[in-house]
Amino acid sequence: MPRIRHLAIVSPNRERLVNFYTTAFEMRVVYGHPTSTHLSDGDFNLAIVDQNSDLKPGLYVLGFDVDDLQDLEGSLRNAGASSDLTPMPKDHDAEYRVHDPDGNRLDLAIHGWCVV
């Protein structure tokens, strides 16, 4: 069964959101990037991504651990996924991306998300 393991949120004020989630939910900063900060509660990853001209505030991507991509691919298509599975670059946490019927990005990781 696929499991939600990652969520990325675009923010016009990354520092404010990092402070909110680390204070209110006691999440830990697990690593930083020039344009994002990654938090974890030990089971779930949350990335706060800087807003830019291409990204609007709000949901950027929802990430799932998946066990069987072949079965899931058929389920995604039957449920109305708005795109086919797209392979992701090797340095990406997920192996594939697909979009739900509303166009939201879904990242699929076969190897599992690195949760610290």
Segments from the language model and where they lie:
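Conserved short beta-strand elements that form part of the metal-binding/catalytic scaffold
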Residues: 28-59, 105-112
